[in-house]
Amino acid sequence: MTVIDGKALGVKLQAALAEKTARLKEEKGLVPGLVVILVGENPASQVYVRNKERSALAAGFKSEVVRVPDTISESDLLDLIERYNQDDEWHGILVQLPLPAHISEEKVLLAIDPDKDVDGFHPTNMGKFWSGHPVMIPSTPAGIMEMFKEYQIELEGKSALVIGRSNIVGKPMAQLLLDADATVTIAHSRTKNLPDLARQADILVVAIGRGHFVTKEFVKLGAVVIDVGMNRDENGKLIGDVKYDEVSEVASYITPVPGGVGPMTITMLMEQTYEACVRSAK
């Protein structure tokens, strides 16, 4: 069994990104700029934002975190986003989710300039992605594909099951696997006979948001298991959707939590910010 080390791969890719960024600054005078808007004081969101800021600075980017209270009005938040849309120094705009109940997530995502939507959630970018002309790709699935590439995991002709159907992970993950010539099934919490279905998969991507949902009985011998889950157990410990200790006994490759998919998500956000900066100069 091989542990897929997303943390180490992220460090490797971000070192290469820092070199590209230095060359871009030297040759074209361009510095990628990433702004992250944090609404309120959600502890988990603050950790994610801090990690994004740290990665942006390590890559040589211009980085800013804008913290606003959770009492901010929807219109004021939209005005703030528009200010960064109009500022050419910023190439990536992220609004950290979740948002307070009085603010429409859909309106906020629509407000971000598609050219600066490095999360890849704007309908314009989603449409380009689904039609086979991707510009911004949701970063978690993109990071998982980089893992497959780094570890030389063959996808062509393989049976892949994605457990989870969100627009952020499940659906785009399935599309990327299809594009790599895997045969793909999407399952979810209401799928019948899910363990039986899962045991047929060569590649298992789990993004269902339930701690230790996938046990050994879901996994056939030699399967590749990618755990996207980020949950807390009763002791506050970070755990994945996969019961790592027992599934690692049967999997050929597996991602840990933490240190698996999470670091790669942030790495791909940085890559897409860099690419957005390069495109802005054309």
UniProtKB/Swiss-Prot annotation:
Transmembrane segments: none annotated. NADP(+) binds at G164, R165, S166, S189. GO terms for biological process: L-histidine biosynthetic process; methionine biosynthetic process; purine nucleotide biosynthetic process; tetrahydrofolate interconversion. Its EC number is 1.5.1.5, 3.5.4.9. Pfam families: THF_DHG_CYH (PF00763), THF_DHG_CYH_C (PF02882). Keywords: Amino-acid biosynthesis, Histidine biosynthesis, Hydrolase, Methionine biosynthesis, Multifunctional enzyme, NADP, One-carbon metabolism, Oxidoreductase, Purine biosynthesis. CDD domains: NAD_bind_m-THF_DH_Cyclohyd. One of its GO terms (molecular function) is methenyltetrahydrofolate cyclohydrolase activity. Pathway: One-carbon metabolism; tetrahydrofolate interconversion. It catalyses: (6R)-5,10-methylene-5,6,7,8-tetrahydrofolate + NADP(+) = (6R)-5,10-methenyltetrahydrofolate + NADPH; (6R)-5,10-methenyltetrahydrofolate + H2O = (6R)-10-formyltetrahydrofolate + H(+). GO terms for cellular component: cytosol. InterPro entries: Aminoacid_DH-like_N_sf, NAD(P)-bd_dom_sf, THF_DH/CycHdrlase, THF_DH/CycHdrlase_cat_dom, THF_DH/CycHdrlase_CS, THF_DH/CycHdrlase_NAD-bd_dom. Catalyzes the oxidation of 5,10-methylenetetrahydrofolate to 5,10-methenyltetrahydrofolate and then the hydrolysis of 5,10-methenyltetrahydrofolate to 10-formyltetrahydrofolate. Homodimer. NCBIfam families: PRK10792.1, PRK14179.1, PRK14186.1. Belongs to the tetrahydrofolate dehydrogenase/cyclohydrolase family. This is Bifunctional protein FolD. It comes from Streptococcus suis (strain 05ZYH33). The lineage of its organism: Bacteria, Bacillati, Bacillota, Bacilli, Lactobacillales.
